[in-house]
Structures are given as structure tokens and as C-alpha cells.
Amino acid sequence: MINIFDMMGPVMVGPSSSHTAGAARIGNMGRTLLGEEVARADIGLYGSFAETGYGHGTDRALLAGLLGMKPDDLRIPNAYEEANRAGMAYSFRTVELCDAHPNTALLELTGKSGKQLTLQASSIGGGAIVVNKIDGIDVNFTGDFNTLIVRNQDESGSVAAITSILSQVHINVANMSVNRHRRGGDALMVIETDQHIKPRQVEFLSELPGILSVTYYDKEDDEDGAGFDEGNL
């Protein structure tokens, strides 16, 4: 359901909610999912992001988000200078994508430790975004919920183990999807929750058998959530 704040648009540094606010959120999402400071960002622009994005500040907004800035950060117009100051290398190019939204960015990120992440996401209007792919695996989430991204071995029991533990600590699953490249390979669980998930909960989940990594995206206006009741584990 659309509310009055969706119609008014986000608080942001302009000029465009799609090309600027949404782009900043995409960059910020990439930084969060990488899990560390970005050392290098190779950024592909598709559709109107490529055609008119530079005039609307899409490039600066993406860089700003990758530096951890929110859409209303007054430093966004100076994002190139901020990136250079932070020692973050970057490049931009036009890309062709199949069946993608016109306002789509492809981020190929390398962190300070050498960790790598590829993220494809679209800005769909009013500052809202949709994440389409992570490391080439199809996903579909918006960042409007607290979100767990779980990379696991594609074997029976992995999904049940995660959801069982979330249930034990009274964390309600709002939406969930599981995608994979192929049977028996790596898979991605995307779990959107109503409650906040604490760092020690994320760490506990990451240590379960068959779980390769767990990344947590905390929505901006998150509320305090339930803690692990260790007596139940």
C-alpha cells in the first residue's frame, strides 16, 4: 500500500528521487552487502541511468552511497572528492542488461580485504530500489525490511535450520526466497524480517552447518528486536 510519504518522495539531496536518492540507496546497499569499506568500484550504468544519469547526479549518488552516505547527505555533490579522499578507486561504463529496469546499476565491488561482490539493483521511483542479482544469482528485495542474505550449500535442512532458529527467538519472517545457480551448488536465501536482528544472532546463524556466509541489512528505521534466548538454543 502506498502511503503519503511515498507520494511526497524521500528527504534527499536532489535533483531526482530516481536518479539520485535511489542511486544513493543502491550504493549504500552494495557497501552493506560487501560488509566492509569499498576499495574499488567498477560501476555499470544501464538505460536512463546511462543516458541521463550524469546530468542528474547518478554517478555522484552511487559513489556517495558506496562511501556510506544516505540520500539526504549534503556531501553528495562532492562525492568524487570524497571518494578520492577515502582512497576509493572507481570507474563508470555503459552496460547492456537483459530485461532490466531502465534505472539499473551493476556494481562490481572489491573491499579493503580483497573481498568481492557483484550487485545489480534498480531504482524504481520515489527513492525506492529493488535488488535484482547478487553475484549473478537472481534475488528480489527492496531494503524496506530488515534482511538476511544467507549463502548456503544447496542441501536439505539449511532453510529449516535458519527459519527454526528465527522462530525460537520470536523473529517473524515477512518474506523469504531461495535461489540457486544449479542443484547442489551454492544457493542464496533472502529473508526479510519484521524484527531487528542483533550481531550475535547473525554470527550464530553463520556458524550453522552448510552455511557459507550471512550478511545482514538493517533498514534505516529499524526497531529494537528480540535477543537470543540462549536457553532455547
Give each language-model segment a name:
Residues 9-27:
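Conserved phosphate/anionic-ligand binding catalytic regions in large, soluble enzymes, centered on
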Residues 92-95, 119-233:
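A conserved regulatory-domain signal marking ACT and ACT-like small-molecule sensing domains
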Residues 13, 29-39, 67-71, 85-89, ...:
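Generic secondary-structure signature for well-ordered alpha-helical cores
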Residues 42, 46-85:
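A structural-propensity feature for long, helix-poor, extended segments
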Residues 52-60, 102, 187-192:
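Short glycine/threonine-rich loop-to-helix capping motif typified by GTGT followed
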Residues 26, 68-71, 76-78, 85-87, ...:
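Protein-protein interaction/assembly regions in multi-subunit complexes
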Residues 1-11, 41-44:
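Short, hydrophobic/aliphatic alpha-helical segments
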